[in-house]
Amino acid sequence: MAKETFDRSKPHVNIGTIGHVDHGKTTLTAAITTVLANKGLAAKRDFSSIDNAPEEKERGITINTAHVEYSTANRHYAHVDCPGHADYVKNMVTGAAQMDGAILVVAATDGPMPQTREHILLARQVGVPQLVVFMNKVDMVDDPELLELVEMEIRELLSFYDFDGDNIPVVQGSALGGLNGDAKWVGTIEQLMDSVDNWIPIPPRLTDQPFLMPVEDVFSITGRGTVATGRIERGVINSGEPVEILGMGAENLKSTVTGVEMFRKILDRGEAGDNVGLLLRGIEKEAIRRGMVICKPGSVTPHKKFKAEVYVLSKEEGGRHTPFFNNYRPQFYFRTTDVTGIISLAEGVEMVMPGDNVTISVELINAVAMEKGLRFAIREGGRTVGAGQVTEILD
C-alpha cells in the first residue's frame, strides 16, 4: 500500500482507546477505520492486524502498541491501541504514546471494571486532558434502565477522578455492529468521532510554547564565544533574544543568543525539533554543562523534590531482579543527564516489585529544570530500571 503523505492542512491530534480487557477497544479501533475508510478518510484495518500489535522498545521497555491513522472531515488523528493491560500502563506512564485525549471503552454488559478505574486514574495522573466515552455492546442489553445505570456509574467514576463527568460525551453503540457495516451501529461510530472532534482539544503546537533547549554539549569558538548545542524541545529562538540557563547548579545565569548555528550555517532562528548550536554572549564555557537547560527567562524553574508515577521494568525487560525499598537511591535521567535521587514510597507501601507501577516521591541531590509532565528514566549502573513522569512538584 502506498504510504500517504502526512496531510498538514488538518490539525493533528494523538488519541487512543483505553478501558477494561475484552470491552471492545480493538474492535472499536477497527470499526473507526472501517467506517472512515468508506468515506475515503482512512485505510481500513482489520481486527487481527491491530490485535497483533508489533513489539516496540521505548527506553528498553517492551510495549505492544498498534498505531492507526485516520482523518475526519476536520482533523488528522494518530490512534494507539494496546492489546494487553500491562502495555497500557507502560505506554501511559512512560509517555511512549503521548495522548491528547482518549476514548474510554466500557461494555454495557459489564459496566465499569477494575481496569476501567485504573485507566481513568492513569489518564488523570499523566495529564490526558480529555476523555470521550464509548459505551459498547449496547446491542446485547435489552433493558434501557440498565444502560442508564451504567452511564451514571461511568459519569460518577469520571467525576471521582476529576474529569468533567457531568458533561463528557457518552456515546452508546456497538463496535462489532459498526465493523460489520450495520447501518444503525455505523451511525454510532460516526457520532463517536463527532464527539471526539468536538470534545478533545487540539494540543498547543510546540512552536507556540516558551523556548527550551536541553544542553548536550558546550564548546568555545575563538573570537565568537561559547556555543551550547542541543535539540530544541519547544518554542522558537531568534538571534538577539535573552535566555536563562538553569539546573545542575547553574547560579543565576543569563545571556543573549547572538546566533543560531545549524548545519554549519549561522541562522537567525531555530525552532522546536531543530538540532542547533546557540552562540551565547558573555558566558564562560566552564559555566555551562550537559544537563542544564537554556530557556525563555522565567518560563521554567529548577526543583529537587517531586512526586511521580513510575513503571518499574520487569526482570524479563532487563530491569531489577529484586524489589526496592524506601530510600532507594538510583539515578534519574532527565533530558540529557543523570541525577542521583532518593525515593520515598507512599505510606503503607513496603516495597516495589519489578513490573509494578507505583506513585513515588523523590528528592534529587541537584535541582533540575522541571515541570509537571516531564519524563525521566530511572537508571542503576547505566541500565534502565524504570521510567515515569513528574505528576507534582513538591518544593
UniProtKB/Swiss-Prot annotation:
First-level EC class: hydrolase
Keyword Ligase (UniProt): no
Chain positions recorded as GTP binding sites: 19-26, 81-85, 136-139
Subcellular location: Cytoplasm
EC number: 3.6.5.3
Region feature G1, mapped onto this chain: 19-26
Signal sequence annotation: none
PROSITE patterns hit by this protein: G_TR_1, G_TR_2
Tagged with keyword Nucleotide-binding: yes
InterPro entries: EF-Tu_GTP-bd, EF-Tu_GTPase, EFTu-like_2, EFTU_2, G_TR_CS, P-loop_NTPase, Small_GTP-bd, T_Tr_GTP-bd_dom
Domain tr-type G: 10-205
Catalytic function, reaction form: GTP + H2O = GDP + phosphate + H(+)
UniProt-listed SUPFAM superfamilies: EF-Tu/eEF-1alpha/eIF2-gamma C-terminal domain, P-loop containing nucleoside triphosphate hydrolases, Translation proteins
Main function: GTP hydrolase that promotes the GTP-dependent binding of aminoacyl-tRNA to the A-site of ribosomes during protein biosynthesis.
Subunit structure: Monomer.
Protein name: Elongation factor Tu
UniProt source species: Hymenobacter ocellatus (Parahymenobacter ocellatus)
